[in-house]
């Protein structure tokens, strides 16, 4: 049970693969289908790959809860750490007085499975694998957020959406600051010199907590990150 008056210890959970809710619309979007549905043979291939992943992946997440605040229009402070979170995220989290700092991962099993596909030189499966991994990583975060929100609301508090370095004008290099809240190789995740995570389908980020915190729509219409696949303003169907 989360209690923000506690000593801010680390919470850790392994997620049964069956608890992950696969967002098919998001999957097809990442695969380039927009709002269309792939042909039946491709859907059958996706289903087969999900069965394979259920046998080899161990999704998990861990997080800490720390006090924090908005410092100015572009910076948040969590404990003693100052984040260059940018205007979009800072504004969205302006009411938060505590923050969840998290790491979530599909696990090393995905990387081993994905390497085998690459070695087999199956371009279709390789393409599907990358999209599946991304959706599974988001599903891990969704499970975590749902559980956190349920417990936080019992205390009369609310949570924000999740925000991660590399999105919404928050520099990717800021992941180093988030990882500093955890022991090395926490959840089996390493951060490379270029601030990429290993296993590859892993996510780090923050969630705001507070009595007046709201879940706001992601501000894709004002984000300057034109290469982001999430940026709906760049999608044409």
What are these model-derived regions, one by one?
Residues 2-126:
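Active-site helix-to-loop segments that bind/position phosphate- or nucleotide-bearing substrates
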Residues 41-44, 48, 135, 139, ...:
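Conserved active-site and cofactor/substrate-binding residues in soluble primary-metabolism enzymes
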Residues 50-57, 148, 152, 224-227:
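Structural signal for hydrophobic packing residues in well-ordered secondary-structure cores
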Residues 55-66, 141-142, 153-158, 229, ...:
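Intrinsically disordered or highly flexible coil/loop and linker segments, enriched in small
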Residues 106-107, 150, 204-208:
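Short secondary-structure transition/capping segments
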Residues 121-181:
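Internal, well-folded beta-alpha domain core
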Residues 155-232:
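Short terminal or interdomain "cap/linker" segment that borders an active site or interface and mediates
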Residues 236-237:
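Short cysteine/histidine-rich metal-coordination sites, predominantly Zn2+-binding motifs
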């Amino acid at each position: 049970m989360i209690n923000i008056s506690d000593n801010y210890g680390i919470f850790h959970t392994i997620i049964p693969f069956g608890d992950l809710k696969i967002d098919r619309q998001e999957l097809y979007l990442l695969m380039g289908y927009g709002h269309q549905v792939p042909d039946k043979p491709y859907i059958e291939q996706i289903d087969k790959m999900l069965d394979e992943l259920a046998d080899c992946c161990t999704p998990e997440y861990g997080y800490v809860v720390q006090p924090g605040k908005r410092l100015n229009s572009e910076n948040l402070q969590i404990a003693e750490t100052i984040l260059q979170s940018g205007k979009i995220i800072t504004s969205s989290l302006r009411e938060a007085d505590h923050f969840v700092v998290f790491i979530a991962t599909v696990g090393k099993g995905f990387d081993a499975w994905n390497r085998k596909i690459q070695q087999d030189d199956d371009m279709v499966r390789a393409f599907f694998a990358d999209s599946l991994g991304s959706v599974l990583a988001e599903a891990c975060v969704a499970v975590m957020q749902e559980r956190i929100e349920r417990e936080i609301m019992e205390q009369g508090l609310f949570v924000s959406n999740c925000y991660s370095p590399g999105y919404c004008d928050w520099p990717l290099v800021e992941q180093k600051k988030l990882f500093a809240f955890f022991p090395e190789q926490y959840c089996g995740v390493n951060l490379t010199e270029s601030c990429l995570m290993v296993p590859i389908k892993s996510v780090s980020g923050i969630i705001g907590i507070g009595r007046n915190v709201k879940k706001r729509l992601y501000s894709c219409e004002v984000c300057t990150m034109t290469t982001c696949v999430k940026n709906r303003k760049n999608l044409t169907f």
